[in-house]
Swiss-Prot record:
Gene Ontology cellular-component terms listed: extracellular region
Entry's Gene Ontology BP terms: defense response to bacterium; innate immune response
Source species of the chain: Rana latastei (Italian agile frog)
The protein's name: Brevinin-2LTa
Main location per the UniProt record: secreted
Biological function: Has antibacterial activity.
Keyword field: Amphibian defense peptide, Antibiotic, Antimicrobial, Immunity, Innate immunity, Secreted
Places the protein is found: Secreted
Tissue/organ expression: Expressed by the skin glands.
Length: 22
């Protein structure tokens, strides 16, 4: 559903930011 998509996007976005700031 839409909520799962939003949550997954948030998770990947956060992980990408954390990975980028290493």
């Amino acid at each position: 559903g839409l909520w799962e998509t939003i949550k997954n996007f948030g998770k990947t976005f956060t992980l990408n930011i954390l990975d980028y700031t290493k």
